Amino acid sequence: MAERLNAAAWTEIGLRVLADQGVEAVRVEPLARALGVTKGSFYWHFSDRRELLDSMLVHWKQLATHDVIETVERASDEPAERLRELTRLVFRHGGPLDRAVRAWASHDDAAANAIARVDAERYTFVRRLLEEHGLPAEVAARRAHLLYTSLVGEQHTSLRLSRKRRVDWALFNLESLLDLP
């Protein structure tokens, strides 16, 4: 495996460990053991742990924001259906990793800045979809805030519920926001 190992492999395992155990568990030696390589392999790709953590934030933003937006945009021509798909995708992919990045952001400026940029980008996307659905800009802005914070909150407060139940509730919230005058 070592001959095929690249920086992306380190970043991906770092994200898995982050989602499962938190940022403090993202350490070079345990990651190297998990990958079946020496620490030297790590330093071939990264100068230090901070560089790996920064790479993880970039990759997380791509996976959890850009890739999701691209998938949603391809899902339908109808803004309401794209919002439904976005809601489903949030619960299909986002939970543990997003929660871990938010926890990390509570004590790390780089992670906090990444969260702020991602939140702004996601909010703007939701607002645009609501405007395309026909809501006036000011109403769309307020409902985008409600919807986005609801989706983020659901990932933290309903952990004991089944994914299907959480998606059903989130879709109900979405439909309520779309139907209100």
What are these regions (language model features)?
Residues 96, 100, 147-164, 176-181:
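Amphipathic C-terminal alpha-helical segment
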Residues 55, 69-99, 147:
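Hydrophobic alpha-helical connector segments
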Residues 47-51, 73, 77, 92, ...:
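Residues in soluble alpha-helical coiled-coils and helical-bundle/repeat scaffolds
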Residues 13-21, 67-71, 101, 146, ...:
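Solvent-exposed, amphipathic alpha-helical segments
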